[in-house]
């Protein structure tokens, strides 16, 4: 439902928006290094990168959109923050409480040019909410758009990057989700930019302007590029932000979750410290996902090192769902301080069939070697040879179930496990 609402608003408003942010006047910050080989706006676009005081590890938190859409207010935001504490989510590492679209009034302040928080929704203002979130030891996120309006029609930040970044910093904002709706036609791109240089495309420059504006405030802000996988963002995203959306919105269905895993699996070389492919907000607690599909949803986001932003009314999570999203071993892999790279697909055996998404993944952490197995079909026994796991070789190995912490035994040369329909096995492996 979220994708249809966002895109519907975007398309309707996009048809009405005139090119209010012309190329000659849109940049609100100056370049730190112009290139003589570039022309037009690219020649003067800012090149400064994102702060490395934040964003080293993929974000853990919550976002309001999937739970409440536009029906938000400070009571709901602060309720989520307090539930981080009472449900043990903060202890598990979750820290960002993020406000999505629909938080401001529909027009900017006439004298300051600033976006104005809707006083009927946020009577304490964003700064007042930030103070209360910070008092809990958590961080606050806000939402804007690299277009003239947000997806729901509220003021966007294109052409107003400096004034908006200054406001966000003054309010104590720690995280910015920056969407991609209502882009004027003169800020769009041809099918392929000159020299296939997507970093200097109009799309990238819209985001680079906000990077520079955030940097100028002096306050480190985790910058999330909600660019829907456009403009080959995985090629340049780490030069502009800390994470970047790889697709349109995920929905609470197996087909949506599996398709996003498949799409992301093609671009895992871009994932490392300060550099994360964002597979979108979580749907655990929403829709009709089976228990096994919710486990896979969480596990895949964890082992592929996507940001994990919960997207439901936290009051409604049951104990089983809480156990999934607080699983200590999967979160430890996701947040590993030594190894920044994700698990990647490998061929389990010489005769293993090809699937979409891939079923077998292997990765390293500071605790050892891990294998993750997604069953894309009905319940079946899955087998892999230790010698096919990168870095293992053949021999005898101890295998531990990461979901339960249970030791499964010692095995020679290969390992087999029964995996339920659409479930994921998560294994930690050490040489015996």
Language-model features: locations:
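Fungal secretory targeting signals
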Residues: 1-25
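N-terminal module-boundary/linker segments of secreted carbohydrate-active enzymes
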Residues: 21-78, 83, 221
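Structural recognition of the beta-strand scaffold that forms the well-ordered cores
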Residues: 58-64, 93-100, 139-144, 174-179, ...
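Aromatic-lined carbohydrate-binding/catalytic grooves of carbohydrate-active enzymes
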Residues: 80-195
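Aromatic-lined carbohydrate-recognition surfaces of secreted/lumenal glycan-active proteins
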Residues: 138-156, 211-232
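Glycan-recognition surfaces
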Residues: 163, 219-313
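Carbohydrate-binding surface patches
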Residues: 301-304, 309-311, 352-392
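C-terminal beta-strand-rich structural cap/linker in extracellular carbohydrate-active enzymes
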Residues: 409-432
């Amino acid at each position: 439902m979220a994708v249809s609402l966002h895109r519907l608003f975007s398309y309707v408003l996009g048809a009405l928006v005139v090119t209010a942010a012309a190329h000659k006047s849109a940049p609100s910050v100056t370049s730190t290094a112009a290139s003589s080989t570039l022309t037009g706006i690219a020649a003067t676009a800012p090149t400064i990168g994102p702060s490395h005081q934040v964003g080293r590890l993929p974000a853990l938190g919550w976002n309001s959109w999937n739970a409440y859409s536009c029906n938000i207010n400070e009571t709901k935001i602060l309720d989520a923050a307090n539930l981080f504490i009472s449900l043990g989510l903060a202890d598990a590492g979750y820290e960002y409480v993020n406000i999505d679209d629909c938080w401001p009034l529909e027009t900017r302040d006439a004298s300051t040019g600033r976006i104005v928080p809707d006083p009927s929704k946020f009577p304490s203002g964003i700064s007042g909410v930030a103070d209360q979130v910070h008092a809990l030891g958590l961080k606050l996120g806000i939402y804007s758009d690299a277009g003239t309006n947000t997806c729901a029609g509220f003021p966007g930040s294109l052409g107003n990057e400096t004034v908006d970044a200054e406001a966000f910093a003054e309010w104590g904002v720690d995280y910015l989700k920056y969407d991609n709706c209502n882009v004027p036609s003169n800020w769009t791109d041809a099918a392929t930019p000159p020299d296939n240089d997507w970093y200097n495309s109009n799309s990238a420059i819209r985001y680079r302007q906000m990077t520079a504006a955030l940097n100028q405030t002096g306050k480190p802000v985790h910058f999330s590029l909600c660019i829907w996988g456009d403009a080959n963002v995985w090629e340049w995203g780490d030069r502009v932000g800390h994470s970047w959306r790889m697709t349109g919105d995920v929905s609470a269905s197996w087909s949506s979750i599996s398709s996003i895993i498949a799409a992301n699996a093609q671009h895992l070389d871009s994932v490392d410290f300060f550099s994360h492919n964002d597979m979108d907000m979580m749907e655990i607690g929403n829709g009709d996902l089976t228990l096994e599909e919710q486990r896979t949803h969480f596990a895949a986001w964890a082992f592929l090192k996507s940001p994990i932003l919960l997207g439901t009314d936290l009051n409604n999570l049951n104990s089983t769902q809480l156990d999934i999203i607080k699983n200590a071993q999967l979160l430890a892999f996701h947040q590993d301080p030594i190894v920044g790279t994700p698990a990647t697909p490998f061929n389990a055996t010489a005769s293993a069939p090809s699937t979409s998404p891939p079923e077998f993944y292997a990765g390293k952490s500071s605790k050892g070697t891990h294998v993750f197995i997604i069953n894309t079909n009905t319940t079946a026994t899955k087998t892999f040879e230790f010698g096919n796991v990168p870095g293992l070789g053949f021999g005898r190995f101890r295998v531990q179930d990461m979901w339960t912490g249970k030791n499964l035994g010692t095995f020679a040369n290969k390992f087999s496990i029964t995996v339920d329909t659409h479930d994921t096995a998560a294994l930690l492996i050490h040489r015996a």
